[in-house]
Design a protein with these regions (language model features):
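Alpha/beta enzyme core
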Residues: 2-202
Length: 202
């Protein structure tokens, strides 16, 4: 059912989002999930016929004219930025398609169960694991794993979202990560092949 308070739009249940996506596939059409960094972007993403809108902190940096990799750096509170874009820009203007919130699952300052409740109460219909540590490798990846900022936190976040009846569309970089995400209830799995390129900066 749509929003029980207004009769239309977000938040949707996990199954409602899945059913919408299955309906798209049944028509032989690809699923399109587009990132929005501003309200005006979200408006035209919806008008263009996308299936999902995803909000992540990197969208804010893109709107500033910077590359999406900024979203992986310590240039701001990734969770707060995504929430702010959703609350003040995107959720107020989107009429009907599901909106997904990027969640930085390894943020040690947040009780993730508590944060996800806030995400859901804000009106988001699902979550995405961004910024993601799955695309970090080498020595720094090892340091993250050793110091409690493991990609396992992202699996756990998706598991919590599943318990809260929230849809999840997730990034992975290996088959093993894909398996773990599915075990935790992920609904859609994206093979992350690198950050955005092209345009003026990427």
């Amino acid at each position: 059912m749509p929003n029980p308070w207004t009769g239309i739009g977000n938040p949707y249940t996990k199954q409602e989002v899945v059913d919408r996506l299955k309906a798209t596939l049944a028509k032989g059409e690809p699923i399109i999930a587009a990132g929005a960094g501003t309200g005006i972007s979200a408006k035209f993403i919806e008008k263009g016929g996308a299936d999902l809108i995803i909000i992540y902190n990197s969208g804010r940096f893109r709107m500033m004219g910077h590359g999406s990799t900024c979203g992986l750096m310590a240039y701001g509170d990734a969770n707060a930025i995504a929430m702010e874009i959703g609350e003040y820009e995107v959720l107020p203007v989107v009429k009907e398609i599901p909106v997904v919130c990027g969640v930085h699952a390894t943020d040690p300052r947040r009780r993730m169960w508590h944060w996800l409740q806030q995400v859901k109460n804000m009106g988001f219909s699902g979550v995405n694991n961004f910024p993601t540590h799955c695309i970090v490798d080498g020595h720094f990846r090892g340091v993250l794993e050793e110091t409690g900022m493991s990609v396992k936190k992202e699996f756990e976040m998706v598991g919590l979202a599943t318990k809260m009846d929230m849809f999840s569309i997730v990034y992975v970089a290996t088959p093993e990560e894909a398996v773990e995400m599915v075990k935790n209830g992920a609904d859609a799995v994206i093979a992350h092949v690198g950050t955005t390129v092209g345009g003026s900066i990427g």
